């Protein structure tokens, strides 16, 4: 006679099923939390930056096209699945088990799709997502080995006999949660105006660290001949293989159009690759030194190469692609050219000039992107609305100061005029 409790009442499979459910819940919670922190930081100190590795990077996932569905972070659906699996282990029943087996089958299919998308399209893996994948596969394997219908040995009997009542109940609860999640997401997005004002205030309160002793001659935006003459002066310590640097580049592409003629952006090479950067303890982004040399080889073509690298972000990790890039731009000698290496090294070394911001790191510049905006340092990047607010404040300050200088007349001059 076939038993009717979860995973045939076997103790360890049932405990493991509970652990897999709780694991999916925990991983989903941190995924959702990171999604909102990355996309809607509450303060200037929560900006996203790269200092883990090129592959294991959660920001790439948080900024991707599939991070949300109609405003719902996909981690929410993982949270629901994990909750159902954990509850099924605590309150076992034949119907609950068959329903969870069906859900676990669909869940593992989704995991496969997301894994393929992350690895082959994004070229990275979020550690929180990886944790969810592991627990999801564990749950599926447990239902496969110990679930109902094992004596029949057929896929249909194991995974395609859910309880319609439980499915409907789960769908209703999920729908209520979806509504709440959408409302919360909208509230976070709508609150960005108020957050932007707070960001501007926090930016003003940052200590003035000043510009580096050597400002890179490689500018992505030039509004004035002299760097300090623009209302917005941005020095961008960046790595061509950093996903957060890609995000910042996309933000700046929008902002440079809106603030045309008012912004200078100097690209300060800072590859997180120990081949050319002594600050980096290990090769976080192998190949980024090569890309820096290629981009720096011919200053006249820097912007072209810069844009092409970021437009082919995933391909840029491939050594063959980098060789072809160098060939097309006539920069085959870049990797051995002492002049190119010297200027890139000079730019990198300016990162050592800043006082360290954490006891964990020896220098102030230690991750990418790091921005020096009008002499103030921001580690990481910020959402478009917040960056725009900071830029607008700088422009208004500059124009107000300019107007004051133009219309201000000394007291003695006014007396003479009378």
Provide a role label for each language-model segment.
Residues 235-238, 246-328, 361-363, 405-418:
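Structural alpha/beta surface segment adjacent to cysteine/selenocysteine redox centers
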């Amino acid at each position: 006679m076939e038993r009717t409790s979860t995973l045939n009442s076997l103790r360890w499979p049932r405990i493991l099923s509970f652990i897999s459910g709780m694991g999916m819940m925990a991983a989903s919670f941190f995924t959702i939390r990171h999604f909102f922190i990355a996309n809607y930081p509450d303060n200037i100190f929560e900006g996203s930056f790269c200092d883990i590795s090129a592959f294991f990077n959660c920001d790439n996932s948080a900024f991707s096209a599939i991070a949300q569905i109609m405003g719902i972070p996909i981690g929410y659906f993982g949270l629901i699945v994990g909750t159902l699996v954990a509850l099924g282990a605590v309150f076992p029943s034949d119907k609950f088990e068959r329903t969870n087996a069906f859900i676990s089958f669909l869940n593992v299919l989704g995991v496969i799709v997301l894994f393929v998308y992350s690895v082959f399209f994004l070229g990275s893996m979020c550690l929180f997502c990886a944790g969810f994948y592991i627990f999801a596969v564990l749950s599926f394997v447990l239902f496969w080995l110990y679930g109902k219908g094992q004596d029949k040995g057929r896929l249909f009997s194991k995974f395609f006999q859910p309880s319609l009542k439980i499915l409907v109940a789960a769908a209703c609860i999920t729908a209520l949660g979806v509504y709440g999640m959408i409302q919360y997401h909208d509230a976070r997005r709508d609150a960005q105006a108020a957050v932007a004002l707070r960001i501007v205030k926090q930016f003003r309160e940052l200590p003035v660290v000043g510009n580096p002793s050597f400002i890179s001659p490689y500018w992505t935006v030039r509004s004035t001949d002299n760097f300090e003459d623009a209302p917005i002066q941005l020095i961008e310590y960046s790595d061509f293989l950093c996903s957060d640097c890609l995000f910042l580049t996309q933000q700046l592409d929008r902002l440079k159009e809106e603030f045309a003629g008012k912004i200078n952006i100097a690209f300060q090479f800072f590859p997180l690759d120990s081949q050319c950067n002594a600050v980096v303890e290990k090769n976080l982004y192998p190949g980024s030194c090569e890309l820096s040399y290629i981009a720096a080889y011919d200053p006249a073509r820097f912007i072209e190469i810069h844009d092409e690298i970021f437009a082919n972000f995933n391909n840029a990790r491939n050594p063959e692609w980098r060789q072809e890039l160098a060939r097309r731009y006539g920069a085959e000698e870049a990797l051995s050219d002492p002049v190119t290496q010297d200027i890139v090294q000079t730019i990198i070394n300016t990162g050592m000039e800043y006082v360290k911001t954490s006891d964990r790191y020896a220098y102030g510049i230690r991750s990418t992107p790091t921005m020096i905006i009008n002499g103030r340092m921001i580690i990481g990047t910020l959402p478009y609305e917040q960056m725009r607010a900071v830029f607008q404040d700088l422009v208004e300050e500059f124009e107000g100061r300019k107007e004051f200088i133009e219309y201000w007349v000394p007291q003695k001059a006014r007396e003479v005029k009378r």
